[in-house]
């Protein structure tokens, strides 16, 4: 109750502060208008308010505003689609990025008036606003998305791909979540700019039935109050459009993640073996040929029979993680616990497990496994709130419920005490279900609790 009261008090203070600022600038406006004493040059707030009221009460105003808004949003949507496609290609091809970037930088630096005049020559006044908005918004969308894709968490994407999360599910679970902060930043800058570019294009092109045409008419007739009233309407429409679109973008993140979680296991049947359907085929890997950068692995050939258990031991830097990564690439999609933590920090422990789980795994069984491995855990708590040992066991639960013919564990018991390690090892033995099991560790006790006797020492 106190927190609610405090929140309401803070909101009231914010509203009061905003009102005080607005009152100050209205007073400044009234003072300057009184000093100028020329309504044709600078009408006062009262005259502009009357003109604005007259426009609001005219149904034609809303039709004109809606038409201009639709064209502006159409150009913005086209820029978003094309910018996304170009950014996607650029993230996969450095040559393509070098080819596209100069052209978009040139467009970004070109004055709006020059662009509009050229578009009028090429397209005519009817379509000039859509094209102008498209060209003005495209560079901002492209560079923001390209930056977001460049800075995306590559190890986390590797984890998703290895666990069979691909296609639209990978986009919803990872790609969109990674680029969304960049998209939000871009939206705040581009939406307002798009309205300015669109109205400017209508004004220069004198497109019939548009906001730009009405502003031009007000200028010809020296109806300054009407001109300012239309300006207020455009600013309000731009502000409302930005607020709505930014809100929709914010909501899209959790919605996309939820869709990926609900569709767990989608598309994996026929590509990956679910637990209980039989072990993966044997693995024969000439490790030295695959990793020439790792001298410690030179000449090593890894042979693992179907359903076999292998432990790889060695000092830090001996190449254990490299060996397991190569094996995972051969077995993908498979289940893997990486040496470094790879979790979606903003999501719950349960969702982190379910997003990679087999389609036959429901939320109740995933939650039961989490509670077994992490006694007392709130499965709906964000993993960022969990301790290191708890987070480790969330990753182990994810690996055990993920479909695939192999379970690969890289230092899985790091941060666990002996009791937690024993409980976790029992769960691994119960649920790996005859699949190939590869373990990397520096502690022989880890191999013992998992009943692994075949040990490779690097």
Spell out what each predicted region is.
Residues 131-135, 168-201, 234:
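Transmembrane alpha-helices
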Residues 340, 346-359:
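Q-loop/switch helix immediately C-terminal to the Walker
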Residues 363-378:
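Conserved ABC ATPase "signature" region
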Residues 382-386, 390:
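Conserved ABC ATPase signature
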Residues 410, 417:
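ABC-family nucleotide-binding domains
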């Amino acid at each position: 109750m106190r927190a609610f009261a405090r929140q309401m008090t803070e909101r009231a203070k914010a509203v009061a502060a905003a009102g005080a600022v607005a009152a100050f600038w209205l007073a400044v406006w009234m003072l300057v208008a009184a000093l100028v004493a020329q309504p044709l040059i600078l009408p006062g707030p009262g005259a502009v308010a009357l003109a604005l009221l007259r426009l609001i009460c005219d149904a034609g105003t809303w039709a004109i505003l809606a038409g201009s808004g639709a064209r502006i949003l159409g150009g913005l949507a086209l820029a978003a689609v094309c910018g996304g496609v170009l950014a996607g290609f650029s993230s996969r091809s450095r040559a393509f990025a070098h080819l596209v970037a100069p052209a978009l930088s040139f467009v970004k630096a070109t004055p709006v008036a020059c662009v509009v005049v050229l578009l009028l020559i090429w397209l005519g006044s009817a379509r000039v606003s859509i094209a102008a908005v498209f060209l003005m918004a495209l560079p901002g969308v492209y560079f923001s998305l390209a930056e977001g894709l460049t800075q995306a968490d590559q190890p986390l994407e590797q984890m998703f791909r290895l666990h069979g999360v691909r296609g639209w599910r990978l986009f919803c679970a990872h790609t969109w979540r990674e680029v969304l902060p960049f998209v939000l930043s871009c939206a705040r800058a581009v939406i307002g700019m798009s309205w300015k570019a669109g109205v400017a294009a209508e004004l220069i092109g004198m497109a019939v039935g548009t906001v730009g045409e009405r502003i031009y008419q007000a200028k010809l007739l020296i109806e300054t109050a009407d001109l300012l009233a239309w300006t207020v309407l455009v600013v309000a429409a731009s502000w409302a459009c930005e607020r709505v679109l930014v809100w929709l973008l914010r909501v899209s993140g959790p919605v996309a993640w939820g869709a990926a979680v609900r569709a767990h296991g989608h598309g994996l049947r026929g590509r990956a073996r679910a637990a209980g359907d039989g072990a993966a085929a044997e693995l024969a890997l000439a490790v030295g040929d695959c990793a020439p950068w790792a001298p410690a692995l030179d000449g090593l050939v890894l042979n693992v029979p179907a359903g076999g258990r292998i432990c790889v031991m060695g000092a830090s830097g001996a190449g254990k993680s490299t060996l397991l990564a190569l094996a995972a690439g051969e077995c993908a999609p498979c289940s893997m616990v990486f040496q470094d933590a790879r979790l979606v920090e903003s999501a719950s422990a349960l969702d982190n497990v379910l997003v990679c789980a087999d389609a036959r795994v429901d939320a109740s069984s995933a939650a039961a496994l989490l509670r077994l491995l992490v006694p007392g855990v709130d499965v709906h708590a964000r993993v960022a709130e969990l301790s290191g040992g708890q987070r480790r066991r969330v990753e182990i639960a994810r690996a055990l419920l993920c479909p695939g013919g192999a379970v690969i564990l890289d230092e899985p018991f790091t941060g666990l005490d002996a009791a937690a390690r024993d409980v976790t090892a029992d769960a691994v033995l119960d649920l790996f279900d005859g699949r190939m099991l590869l373990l990397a560790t520096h502690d022989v006790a880890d191999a013992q609790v998992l009943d692994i006797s075949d040990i490779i020492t690097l």
